[in-house]
């Protein structure tokens, strides 16, 4: 975020209503009775000759309307309710045809560029830098806060959210699509909620909660990477500033304070209620969405755009769980980056020696699974002790964005160090939604997990400015180093003593005649060899 590129936020809301957008769950053009009944979401780019004449920008070679490809490989046994959830084989319960864009073109109608590209022909590379929030200037910090606040209040220009399941999507009369408008930031919250919500099994039946399309499996990192990328691109469009980038919060401080919880950043603690945000912060005005879980689970409805109570936050305030009163240590990150396998069977929250499970926080920083442990990402969420510590609500607290950009930075560093080895990302038998080729729920257009399993600077148009901690040695490693050093010292002393003895012997020989009967003739030793060309070593 360069200061000279800042825009006045007060003058850009109206133009947003007609700006192009890429990241809708379902584009507004597809939220119609006809599109839903036909199962086709291939909007026109420039329909100069009438509707349906330029689907997916086909007239200019940007894309084409194709059948959706959905992963059908088996998932793990954690989910036993096949056929009962709209998120299965995403997004085929709603649409079975969508745009497939060519080259670097992207978007619901192939009207924009893939991440990392810009220009009318999407042939110009672009690279933005995600920096440490605390390293930003006062002007840059204020710009970020105001941009987030604007995203919270600005209706998304291109998409709507479903408020009913697929069997009820056309309403009681069969002709009233059940969609609502929602703000840019609240859509960011909604997508997260939709990925973690329970499976509704029917009236009078308890909803199934052991399902999660974005956590506790290999897709944790790829899903949240795209989630952030979506928000960043949405905000770039909103600000009309392609250089805008999301900073990160380096939560690995080992401290029991939240160093970004100040009124010029994410908001300090309220003087009137320690679980609320200070009135001096704009975030005290924010109201959460997707909090009516009981209604969703018993009535089978979905989260809508209705806002509820304020953000709750009480960093290090959970006195009942001392383990979550202090943030991860810098060395935890260093140790995590030494776990060389991306994921390991059963590809779940009990995997051991799994980098994914380690950075997610279900294993200790060395990769060893321990059911009592909460580390790194999980620990940072729980430390916030409020809205940010509840999975379905956590993105309502804007700290979520900064926490996950740092988690993504760790992921990208791991990809760089280990050359993005996809062989440890399971092709099948991961929890539902977590197979390598699964379309991540509920993103649109469909995008697979493996498409995000790439180094960001080379493939996604962003990089991180971060210094990684070096790893301290453990006690056992220090003992090993000490033993090796001692043995090396003994070897040096022995070698020195041998040299002194040899030198004294050579000095005595120097006083003897050059040729005597005891002289070892070279020819005689050579003749003793069976093969003169064979080494004696």
UniProtKB/Swiss-Prot annotation:
Molecular function, one GO term: monooxygenase activity
PROSITE patterns for the chain: TYROSINASE_1 (PS00497), TYROSINASE_2 (PS00498)
Q: So what does this thing catalyse?
A: 2 5,6-dihydroxyindole-2-carboxylate + O2 = 2 indole-5,6-quinone-2-carboxylate + 2 H2O
Q: Where does Zn(2+) A bind?
A: 192, 215, 224
Lumenal, melanosome-side stretches of the chain, per the record, are 25-480
The pathway entry for this protein reads as: Pigment biosynthesis; melanin biosynthesis
List GO terms (cellular component aspect).
melanosome; melanosome membrane
Q: Which residues bind Zn(2+) B?
A: 377, 381, 404
Q: Which Gene3D superfamilies match?
A: Di-copper center containing domain from catechol oxidase (1.10.1280.10)
Topological domain ranges for the Cytoplasmic compartment: 502-537
Q: What is its EC number?
A: 1.14.18.-
- Parts of the chain that traverse the membrane: 481-501
Q: Which UniProt keywords apply?
A: Copper, Disulfide bond, Glycoprotein, Melanin biosynthesis, Membrane, Metal-binding, Monooxygenase, Oxidoreductase, Signal, Transmembrane, Transmembrane helix, Zinc
User: Could you say how this protein's activity is regulated?
Assistant: The activity depends critically on the nature of the bound metal ion. Catalyzes the oxidation of 5,6-dihydroxyindole-2-carboxylic acid (DHICA) in the presence of bound Cu(2+) ions, but lacks activity in the presence of bound Zn(2+) ions.
Question: What's its membrane topology?
Answer: Single-pass type I membrane protein
Primary localization class, coarse? membrane
- Give a yes or no for keyword Transmembrane in this entry: yes
What cofactor does its activity depend on?
Cu(2+); Zn(2+)
Q: Which of the seven top EC classes does this enzyme belong to?
A: oxidoreductase
Cofactor note text: Contains bound zinc ions after heterologous expression in insect cells, giving rise to a protein that lacks DHICA oxidase activity.
User: How is the subunit organization of this protein annotated in UniProt?
Assistant: Monomer. Interacts with ATP7A. Interacts with SLC45A2.
Q: What does this protein do?
A: Plays a role in melanin biosynthesis. Catalyzes the oxidation of 5,6-dihydroxyindole-2-carboxylic acid (DHICA) into indole-5,6-quinone-2-carboxylic acid in the presence of bound Cu(2+) ions, but not in the presence of Zn(2+). May regulate or influence the type of melanin synthesized. Also to a lower extent, capable of hydroxylating tyrosine and producing melanin.
Protein name from the UniProt record: 5,6-dihydroxyindole-2-carboxylic acid oxidase
């Amino acid at each position: 975020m360069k200061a000279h590129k800042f825009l006045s936020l007060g003058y850009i809301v109206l133009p947003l209503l007609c700006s192009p957008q890429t990241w809708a769950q379902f584009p507004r053009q597809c939220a119609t009775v006809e599109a839903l009944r036909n199962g086709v979401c291939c909007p026109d780019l420039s329909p100069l000759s009438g509707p349906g004449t330029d689907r997916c920008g086909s007239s200019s070679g940007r894309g084409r309307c194709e059948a959706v490809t959905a992963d059908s490989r088996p998932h793990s046994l954690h989910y036993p309710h096949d056929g009962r959830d709209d998120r299965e084989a995403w997004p085929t319960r709603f649409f079975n045809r969508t745009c497939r864009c060519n080259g670097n073109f992207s978007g619901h109608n192939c009207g924009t560029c893939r991440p990392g590209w810009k220009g009318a022909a999407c042939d110009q590379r672009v690279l933005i830098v995600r920096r440490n929030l605390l390293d930003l200037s006062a002007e840059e910090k204020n710009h970020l806060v105001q941009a987030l606040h604007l995203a919270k209040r600005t209706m998304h220009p291109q998409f709507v959210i479903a408020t009913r399941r697929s069997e009820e999507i056309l309403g009681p009369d069969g002709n009233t699509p059940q969609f609502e408008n929602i703000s840019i930031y609240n859509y960011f919250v909604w997508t997260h909620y939709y990925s973690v919500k329970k499976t509704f099994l029917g009236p009078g039946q308890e909803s199934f909660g052991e399902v999660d399309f974005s956590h506790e499996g290999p897709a944790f990192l790829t899903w949240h990477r795209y989630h952030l990328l979506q928000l960043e691109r949405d905000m770039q469009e909103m600000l009309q500033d392609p250089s805008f980038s999301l900073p990160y919060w380096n939560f690995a401080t080992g401290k029991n304070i939240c160093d970004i919880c100040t009124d010029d950043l994410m908001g300090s603690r309220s003087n009137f209620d320690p679980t609320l945000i200070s009135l001096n912060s704009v975030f005290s005005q924010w109201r959460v969405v997707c909090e009516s879980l009981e209604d969703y689970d018993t009535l089978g409805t979905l989260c809508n755009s209705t806002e509820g109570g304020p953000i709750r936050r009480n960093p290090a305030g959970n006195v009942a769980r001392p383990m979550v009163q202090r943030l991860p240590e810098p060395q935890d990150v260093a140790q995590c980056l030494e776990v060389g396998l991306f994921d390991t069977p059963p590809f779940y929250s009990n995997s051991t020696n799994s980098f994914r499970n380690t950075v997610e926080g279900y294993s200790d920083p060395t990769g060893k699974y321990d059911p009592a442990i909460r580390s790194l990402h999980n620990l940072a969420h729980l430390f916030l002790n409020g809205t940010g510590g509840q999975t379905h609500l956590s993105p309502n607290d804007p700290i979520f964005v900064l926490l996950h950009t740092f988690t993504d930075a760790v992921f990208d560093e791991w990809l760089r160090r280990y050359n993005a080895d996809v062989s440890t990302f399971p092709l099948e038998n991961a929890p539902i939604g977590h197979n390598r080729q699964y379309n991540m729920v509920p993103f649109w257009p469909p995008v697979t997990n493996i498409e995000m399993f790439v180094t960001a600077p080379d493939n996604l148009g962003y990089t991180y400015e971060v210094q990684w901690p070096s790893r301290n040695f453990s006690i056992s490693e220090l003992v090993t180093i000490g033993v090796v050093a001692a043995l090396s010292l003994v070897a040096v002393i022995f070698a020195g003593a041998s040299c002194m003895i040899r030198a004294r012997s050579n000095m005595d020989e120097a006083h003897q005649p050059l040729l005597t009967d005891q002289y070892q003739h070279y020819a005689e030793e050579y003749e003793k060899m069976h093969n003169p060309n064979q080494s004696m070593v």
